[in-house]
Amino acid sequence: MLAATFDIGTTAVKAVVVNESGEPVFTGSLVIHTIETGNFKEQDPDEWYGAFCSLSKEMLEIIPAAEIGAIIFSGQMQDVIPVDAEGKALRNAILYSDGRADEQARVIIREAARRNVV
């Protein structure tokens, strides 16, 4: 049995298929572009999906699907991805490293400290 793993990271979507001994039998990676405007940091969720599909296709050209017994996913940290009722992204994902609310966070921290809120 093989295990296919996918990591949707901040810089790339990576795929590795390992055998039962943990040895890689397939590896692939596709760069993901970050849209940076000032302290805004966003990515297009459709680019994540496209990279996943491309890597899956490449993997399945080498490895028969019937040999894959497990699929494992990991992803980025606390990104915000607003979606509609069908689950389609309404806009770019706002990354965890986005700084657009830095000033608001400073105000909240300062006010919480002033009120002895933990």
What are these regions (language model features)?
Residues 1-92, 103:
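N-terminal glycine/serine-rich phosphate-binding loop of ATP-dependent small-molecule kinases
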Residues 97-118:
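Glycine-rich phosphate-binding loop plus the immediately following alpha-helix
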